[in-house]
A protein has these predicted regions:
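Surface-exposed amphipathic alpha-helical segments
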Residues: 55, 188-222
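Proline-anchored loop/turn motifs at beta-strand termini and strand-loop-strand connectors
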Residues: 44-65
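Conserved polar/disulfide-associated segments of primarily extracytoplasmic proteins
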Residues: 62-186, 191
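C-terminal motif of bacterial Sec signal peptides marking the signal peptidase cleavage site
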Residues: 26-29
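Short aromatic-glycine motifs in intrinsically disordered, low-complexity regions
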Residues: 37-48, 131-136, 207
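Soluble non-cytosolic domains of exported or imported proteins
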Residues: 46, 117, 121, 125, ...
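Bacterial N-terminal signal peptides that target proteins for export
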Residues: 1-18
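Bacterial signal peptide processing site
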Residues: 31-34
């Protein structure tokens, strides 16, 4: 399985199609492949990924509103980065963000500026624990099964970690599978993060689609 891509200054094969398809926030794939592209950026740079046409995409405003943040915190969240959510459920809801063992895949894509302290400390361990505190889970009795841990580097100094794991909380009988990728730039100024998760039985049924989504996570140098 291919590692998530980071496009450097030189166009990669298929890059022209991706740029054309990703000219807006979300629109159907140009080739009629059954996927729609989501993009952060408007000048040919930024972060791209694709999800199936039938999945619901929640833009940044909808996602932030669902978090019930104060006006000050909501403004800060917008200033720090970009976040969208997506849901495969036939009854999509941002409430699924708070449900780990969803019956259908649910995901988050985020681009966030790291503060000076985070830049000094951001590491593979930070990438591993970015969405779910994996290390804490194993120390508090949670059962965790690693399925994939692929480190990678790309042109322009980008590097990252693709991590897939299954876990069960001590208080829960249902296993959850998380498939995530973190990419940081050479200066460790921004983290580009994508995660898709659902119950492990759901993941087994949908793993090919989920893999297509995570593999499509592309960062183009600004």
């Amino acid at each position: 399985m291919a590692a998530p891509r980071v496009a450097g200054r030189t166009a990669k094969r298929g890059g022209a199609l991706l740029l054309l398809c990703a000219a807006a926030f979300a629109l159907p794939a140009c080739s009629g492949s059954g996927y729609q592209y989501v993009k952060n950026g408007s000048d040919g740079s930024g972060t791209y990924f694709k999800v199936p046409d039938a999945w619901r995409i929640y833009d940044e405003n909808a996602f932030i509103k669902s978090r019930n943040l104060s006006p000050t915190k909501a403004k800060a969240a917008r200033a720090e980065g970009w976040t969208v959510a997506f849901d495969a459920s036939s009854k999509p809801s941002l409430k699924h963000f708070n449900e780990l063992a969803t019956k259908q895949p649910f995901g988050i894509a985020e681009v966030r500026t790291l503060d000076p302290k985070e830049r000094d400390e951001f590491s593979l361990m930070a990438m591993r624990n970015y969405f779910v505190p994996v290390d804490d889970l194993t120390q508090t009795g949670g059962e965790l099964v690693p399925l994939r841990a692929d480190e990678f580097t790309r042109d322009g100094g980008f590097h990252g970690l693709r991590l897939t794991f299954e876990f069960t909380l001590p208080t829960d009988k249902e296993a959850i599978t998380v498939d995530q990728v973190s990419i940081v730039d050479a200066g460790t100024k921004e983290v580009h993060f994508l995660v898709v998760s659902c119950s492990s039985s759901c993941y087994e049924r949908k793993k090919d689609t989920i893999n297509n989504i995570v593999d499509s996570w592309t960062v183009k140098e600004r």
